[in-house]
């Protein structure tokens, strides 16, 4: 199992646009078979800092996500909204190890 944290620093005047585009991408991502979670988290002290927490079944699922049309649309749409380049960190899950505990029921499916 793979967890990816993507830190996005958004231009303050584009936060609403970024969130709209990101929520559309998150909804599509949750329909992918290898995506277990896709959380969009906004910093309470700095609304222009958004954290994406993406949980994938494995590295192949992460690679498949990056090859989807909806990801390409999101990437291109938000490119000019960034205050600085996005930074991602990949993590291995130590606990819990069961993938069933990570899957979230999608309210959008």
Protein language model features and the residues they cover:
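An amphipathic, aromatic/His-enriched active-site/gating alpha helix that lines ligand/cofactor pockets
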Residues: 20, 24-36, 55-90
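Glycine-rich beta-strand-turn "strand-cap" elements at beta-sheet edges
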Residues: 40-48, 76-109
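Short, well-ordered beta-strand segments in beta-rich or mixed alpha/beta enzyme
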Residues: 2-9, 39-66, 108
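Short, surface-exposed ligand-recognition loops at beta-strand->loop->(often short) alpha-helix junctions
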Residues: 10-18
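Short phosphate-engaging motifs
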Residues: 14, 48, 70
